[in-house]
UniProtKB/Swiss-Prot annotation:
Belongs to the TatB family. It is a single-pass membrane protein. It is found in: Cell inner membrane. It comes from Haemophilus influenzae (strain 86-028NP). The Tat system comprises two distinct complexes: a TatABC complex, containing multiple copies of TatA, TatB and TatC subunits, and a separate TatA complex, containing only TatA subunits. Substrates initially bind to the TatABC complex, which probably triggers association of the separate TatA complex to form the active translocon. Keywords: Cell inner membrane, Cell membrane, Membrane, Protein transport, Translocation, Transmembrane, Transmembrane helix, Transport. This is Sec-independent protein translocase protein TatB. The gene is tatB.
Length: 186
C-alpha cells in the first residue's frame, strides 16, 4: 500500500520507541490501527455504494435503449424481462434513497441526542445547587437549641454506626490523646 520495506518498518518502530517511549507506543499503534480500520471500512462502504449506483445506472440505460427500440415490436418474453428490469431498477433506487435518508436522519438524530444529553447533564447540577441552597437556608434558620439537639442525635447515630463497624475490643484500645501522650513523654 505504502511500499514500505521491512528495514523501513523497523526504522519507524525504533523512532516511535524513542519518541513515544515503551509505555505510549502500544497505545499509539492501537490508535493508528483503529484509524486504518475505520478508513478501510469507509472506503469499502463507498466502493459498495458506487457499485450499486453503477448497476442502477446500467439498468436505467438498458431500459432507455429498450424503450427507444419500441417495446411493442419486441417479443412478449423480452417485454416481461424489460418490465422486471424496470421493477428492479425502481426497487434499487428506492433502497438507495432510503439509505441516504436514513444516513441523513441518523446524523441529525445523533446531534439532537448529544444536545439533549448536554442539557440534561446541566439540569441535575442546577438542581443540586438549589437543594444545597435550601439546605443552607434551613440550617441558618435553626435556633441554637435545635443545633444542640441535632448534634446529640448525630452523636448517637455515629456511635451506633461505629460500634457496629468496630468490634468492642477496638473501642477499648483507643489511641492516646495528645494530653496523655505528652504526659508519658515527660
Amino acid at each position: 500500500m505504502f511500499d514500505i520495506g521491512f528495514s523501513e518498518l523497523i526504522l519507524l518502530m525504533v523512532l516511535g520507541l524513542v519518541v513515544l517511549g515503551p509505555k505510549r507506543l502500544p497505545i499509539a499503534i492501537r490508535t493508528v490501527m483503529d484509524w486504518v480500520k475505520t478508513i478501510r471500512g469507509l472506503a469499502a462502504n463507498v466502493q459498495n455504494e458506487l457499485k450499486q449506483e453503477l448497476k442502477l445506472q446500467e439498468l436505467q440505460d438498458s431500459i432507455k435503449k429498450a424503450e427507444s427500440l419500441n417495446l411493442q415490436a419486441l417479443s412478449p418474453e423480452l417485454s416481461k424481462t424489460v418490465e422486471e428490469l424496470k421493477a428492479q431498477a425502481d426497487k434499487m433506487k428506492a433502497e438507495l434513497e432510503d439509505k441516504a435518508a436514513q444516513a441523513g436522519t441518523t446524523v441529525e438524530d445523533q446531534i439532537k441526542e448529544i444536545k439533549n444529553a448536554a442539557e440534561n447533564a446541566e439540569k441535575p447540577q442546577n438542581a443540586i445547587s438549589v437543594e444545597e441552597a435550601a439546605e443552607t437556608l434551613s440550617e441558618a434558620e435553626k435556633t441554637p437549641t435545635d443545633l444542640t439537639a441535632l448534634e446529640t442525635h448525630e452523636k448517637v447515630e455515629l456511635n451506633t454506626h461505629l460500634s457496629s463497624y468496630y468490634p468492642p475490643d477496638d473501642i477499648e484500645i483507643a489511641p492516646a490523646s495528645k494530653s496523655q501522650s505528652s504526659k508519658t513523654k515527660s
